[in-house]
Amino acid sequence: MDSIPLSTLFIILIICLVLSAYFSGSETGLLSLNKYRLRFLSEQGNKGAKKAEKLLEKPDTLLSFILIFNNLVNISASAIATVIGMRLYGDAGVAIATGLLTFVMLVFSEIFPKTVAAMHAEKVSFFSSHILTSLLKIFYPLVWLMNIFTKSLMQIVGLKLDMQKQVISSEELRSIVSEAGEATPNEQHPQMLLSILDMETVTVDDIMVPRNEIGGINIDDDWRAIMRQLNHAAHNRVVLYKGSLDEQVLGILRVREAFRLLLEKNEFTKETLIRAADEVYFIPESTPLKTQLANFRTNKERIGLVVDEYGDIKGLVTLEDILEEIVGDFTTSTAPSIDKEVIQQSDGSMIIDGSANLRDLNKMFNWELDTEDARTFNGLILEHLEEIPDEGTICEIDGLLITILEVGDNMIKQAKVVKL
């Protein structure tokens, strides 16, 4: 290199530093890309995104190529800087060149380009992917040879190169949806997606109408009572039973069909009502909502009775109940709304009905009440106290100061709640 002018050496040194910055920035930019947005842009026809996605299909090959050439230009820059230093300062120039080059490379070829690439990953990656794709085709034999040595070394030390495609977990997907929801003006859409994810873990037992609130018709009642129950039915289908739910469930009666028969038949008897009822559809209490939604569709059912492992009726669930878990309460729903079960007080406290669903309370107030052993607010308090409390009893559960206001029928009707 003694015959090469200093000006030429400086130009070559600058080129090496620029190339080092390019490879460093390209590596950071490509590895910082959001793979879901990258896939979306690629499907939209973005050429840079398509090439970047293609490069990232084989990350080992891409990294090998970038590291080979990044090290090559760094070593070249170090050699040239040493020659320049010795020409200018003699033997002391080696130390001077080492110190200056280390600073320059750290700032201009590492920190600066990687910071820019991390902040503008798409712009940097899509631009560099065009160049990297062409260079990789030219130097692929060299990269392939280096990968052979690398894989051989990994086998010697007992490591396996696992390039299997990673599958996103439901919790990771939940995090992605939550982050995307922060940038979405419509809060309902991400909430619906999160509700769909919840259907994997939520069971019919969590959302069912409890047994004591099931609206049904006792065929042993007189006609006036039967007509009154038909007129005030909460759903378009009601449970038809004899004596009680424990004794004999006769079927599920369509309210509209009952009124049609009443108008068309001159002799409308209880036997006619029983024959008009559909066969009862039973649902195990541990059935996930996702599964039950599919079962409703497959069996062409809209309502079912939830039973426990002993076959005892625990509650009732409808197709509408499951859909409301996704989209929220329907305006036409006659089921009690959580808004009606919670009364805000001027002092910041609130009055909560004992029948309020714990999952709904957690959603509304961002609480973390345990829903594993209890489904309602009444059940949570009873589980904590292990007895039916007297009115005026005060307890603390999960950061909530709870005062029992009304007790009746062996359950807590209302309680005052203050967030501590």
Curated annotation (Swiss-Prot):
Highest taxon above the source species: Bacteria
Database matches in InterPro entries: CBS_dom (IPR000644), CBS_dom_sf (IPR046342), CNNM (IPR002550), FAD-bd_PCMH-like_sf (IPR036318), FAD-bd_PCMH_sub2 (IPR016169), Ion_transp-like_CBS (IPR044751), Transptr-assoc_dom (IPR005170)
Protein name: UPF0053 protein HI_0107
Protein's UniProt keywords contain Hydrolase: no
UniProt feature coiled coil, ranges: none
Organism: Haemophilus influenzae (strain ATCC 51907 / DSM 11121 / KW20 / Rd)
CNNM transmembrane domain span: 2-190
Main location: membrane
SMART domains with a match to the protein in the record: CorC_HlyC
Topology in the lipid bilayer: Multi-pass membrane protein
Domain CBS: 208-268, 273-333
SUPFAM superfamilies cross-referenced by the UniProt entry: CBS-domain pair, FAD-binding/transporter-associated domain-like
Keywords linked to the UniProt accession: CBS domain, Cell membrane, Membrane, Repeat, Transmembrane, Transmembrane helix
Molecular function, one GO term: flavin adenine dinucleotide binding
Pfam families (alphabetical): CBS, CNNM, CorC_HlyC
TM segment ranges: 3-23, 65-85, 92-112, 126-146
